[in-house]
Amino acid sequence: PAICVIINVQVVKEIDVLIDYLEYLVQLKPKSDRTILIQNDQHTKEGFLYEQEVKKYMATAIEEDLFEVYYQPLYDLKEKRYRTMEALSRLRHPSLGMISPEVFIGIAEKHGQIAKLGYLQFRKVCKFIKEHPQIMEKIESIKYNLSPLELLKSGYSKKLLRTIEEFDIPFSYFQFEITETVATEYSEA
């Protein structure tokens, strides 16, 4: 398929921003073999600027460990009890508010920040388990999401296992799930 994008270059002054904008436009394309038309309209520009702002904030958020972990309990209808919790990463931007995990995880994967972000979050989960042993008496495990890019990083899995040992937590407390963002791309390749 052919992609044609027309951009008013007077709006984009720096080549790096132009390249980022073109990459942003290409990621908007639908997956089909037909001709692709991507609107270069105000809505698209606002989406691009939003992502650029989040991208700028990511380095600070990782460096200062500003990500939060929310725990979502999962209820078993048959057993009539909570069996597990899912650890979910969240990011609050000072002016944009809550950033969708789909946005910040995609940016972290694209810019090589996902392993550092994931490890910071994993340590928080281990600390939470260690500080709240009464919770683990009531549930069986905590689900933790991993990006395929984390798993492909040499030594990363061993680092997670060492962290579990460091906090003296049974390995059985964890269920690891692979996120869909990059996993989908691998399955389509």
Go through the PLM ranges and name each one.
Residues 7, 38-41, 72, 179:
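Conserved beta-strand termini and adjacent loop/short-helix elements that scaffold enzyme active sites
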Residues 1:
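Conserved helix-loop-beta segment at the catalytic/binding core of cyclic-nucleotide signaling proteins
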Residues 31-32, 60, 64, 76-78, ...:
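Nucleotide second-messenger and two-component phosphorelay signaling modules
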